[in-house]
């Protein structure tokens, strides 16, 4: 959950900044805001650009936002075991060794991020290390390693790039239609840019349901990947451990892996992770 929200928040901030720059470029170049191939090309250029900037700085942002400490040299037995386990799983999954980090948090949590398989990070919270046994932590690490092996962050970036493109494009097309007939027929003026910004925020929130749907699907895949690496019983045990823990209510979601209990259909649209019950059931049905 943490890696997805961090990516989305960073991407939204960059998109808003890019939108301002884009509006200036449109005004200077004189591109018709009412719909042209040039407009779509510019939207794609800026839309994908913002998404890839988010991806490029994702590892740095994750370390900075969580205060994580990257393990360069293990300082105790726990860190040595953690580092060695990630190293073994990386070899088994066929990916380069990622950076390993630990950050202070009572919540049992873990995430993987990075711009590519060659520049990735796996981070775990102190709460996870304290609340789970070795087999369960091993399963969680394998889950995160599967995200790296599957290239989930790059795929997420491509999806976000497409969404950014159409959010920017349709925001300007609709804003032009709204302003048509007034003094801003060519999309100029502060009123037009205000409408564009508002529409981008609204469309961005609605379009995030697509990103969240993809995120839920990749969680099932990462669970399956963990089962392949360390065995499905260990992954099931890790999910059940989270299920027994205290539910965290941050934006209606749980910081680690998913949400305890069922949510409404509308709420589920904005969930980055499936409910724990569904994930456990999927693993139990897996042969």
From Swiss-Prot:
GO terms for molecular function: metalloendopeptidase activity; zinc ion binding. Disulfide bonds: none annotated. It holds the Pfam family Peptidase_M48. Zn(2+) binds at residues 143, 147, 219. Its main location: membrane. Its cofactor is Zn(2+). The active site is at 144. It is found in: Cell inner membrane. One of its GO terms (biological process) is proteolysis. The keyword Metal-binding applies. GO terms for cellular component: plasma membrane. Belongs to the peptidase M48B family. The chain crosses the membrane at residues 4-24, 37-57, 158-178, 194-214. It is an enzyme of class 3 (hydrolase). This is Protease HtpX. It is a multi-pass membrane protein. HAMAP family: Pept_M48_protease_HtpX. Keywords: Cell inner membrane, Cell membrane, Hydrolase, Membrane, Metal-binding, Metalloprotease, Protease, Transmembrane, Transmembrane helix, Zinc. Its EC number is 3.4.24.-. Binds 1 zinc ion per subunit.
């Amino acid at each position: 959950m943490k890696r997805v929200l961090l990516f989305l928040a960073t991407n939204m901030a960059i998109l808003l900044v890019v939108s301002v720059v884009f509006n200036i470029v449109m005004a200077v170049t004189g591109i018709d805001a009412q719909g042209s191939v040039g407009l779509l090309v510019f939207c794609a250029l800026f839309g994908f650009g913002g998404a890839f900037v988010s991806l490029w700085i994702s590892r740095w942002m994750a370390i900075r936002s969580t205060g994580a400490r990257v393990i360069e040299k293990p300082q105790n037995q726990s860190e040595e075991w953690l580092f060695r386990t990630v190293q073994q799983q990386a070899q088994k999954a066929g990916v380069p060794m990622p950076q390993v980090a630990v950050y202070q948090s009572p919540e049992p949590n873990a995430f993987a991020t990075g711009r590519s398989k060659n520049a990735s990070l796996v981070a775990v919270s102190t709460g996870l290390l304290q609340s789970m046994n070795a087999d369960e932590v091993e399963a969680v690490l394998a889950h995160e390693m599967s995200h790296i092996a599957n290239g989930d962050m790059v795929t997420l970036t491509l999806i976000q790039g497409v969404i950014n493109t159409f959010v920017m494009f349709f925001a300007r097309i609709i804003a032009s239609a709204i302003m048509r007939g007034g003094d801003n027929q060519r999309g100029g003026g502060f009123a037009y840019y205000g409408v564009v910004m508002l529409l981008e925020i609204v469309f961005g929130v609605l379009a995030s349901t697509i990103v969240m749907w993809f995120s839920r699907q990749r969680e099932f895949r990462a669970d399956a990947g963990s089962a392949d690496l360390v065995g499905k019983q260990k992954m099931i045990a890790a999910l059940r451990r989270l299920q027994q823990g205290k539910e965290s209510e941050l934006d209606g979601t749980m910081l680690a892996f998913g949400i305890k209990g069922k949510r409404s259909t509308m709420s589920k649209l904005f969930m980055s992770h499936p409910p724990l019950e569904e994930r456990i059931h999927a693993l139990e049905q897996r042969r």
